[in-house]
């Protein structure tokens, strides 16, 4: 492994952590109808737990309404149950051909809970990124011995890994800040 490969691997792992954070934040309700809100839901469908987006489409015709249209009408009851049982606090109404979900405005208490959840997810993301940095630094130590890197080269490589880490932590903070503004805004 070369230093470039180590940097690329570190970036790749940190990018994955950022994507997990994005996915977690997308599942938080902000008071606006957003189809991503339901993407993480699993539906009991013919005995298996299936992601909602594999058996239905979710659209937002207006800022306060989500419409879930299943490709299999028999699955609507199961989808309705999954939405009711989720911790999103949503109440779908079954109109026969689709589920209509009115997104109620967030209460102040719920906003505070969501902001706490955003901060928790952001902290988990930062911790994951720092763990990746630690692993990269451990690999760098081994690599420095293998490649007989000088102390200066090793320090430069450590600084580069720290720069990558700072970049991804800043991105995680930006995602969290944006989500907080969405919730409070």
From Swiss-Prot:
Organism per entry: Thermus thermophilus (strain ATCC 27634 / DSM 579 / HB8)
Main location: cytoplasm
Alphabetized Gene3D superfamilies for the sequence: 3.30.1360.40, Ribosome-recycling factor
PANTHER family: MITOCHONDRIAL RIBOSOME RECYCLING FACTOR PSEUDO 1, RIBOSOME RECYCLING FACTOR
CDD domains: RRF
Function as written in the Swiss-Prot or TrEMBL entry: Responsible for the release of ribosomes from messenger RNA at the termination of protein biosynthesis. May increase the efficiency of translation by recycling ribosomes from one round of translation to another.
Gene of this entry: frr
InterPro entries, alphabetized: Ribosome_recyc_fac, Ribosome_recyc_fac_dom, RRF_sf
Keyword field: Cytoplasm, Protein biosynthesis
Localisation: Cytoplasm
Pfam families noted in UniProt: RRF
Biological process according to GO: translational termination
A GO CC term assigned to this protein in UniProt: cytoplasm
HAMAP family (UniProt xref): RRF
GO molecular function: ribosomal large subunit binding
Protein known as: Ribosome-recycling factor
Family as reported in the entry's similarity comment: Belongs to the RRF family.
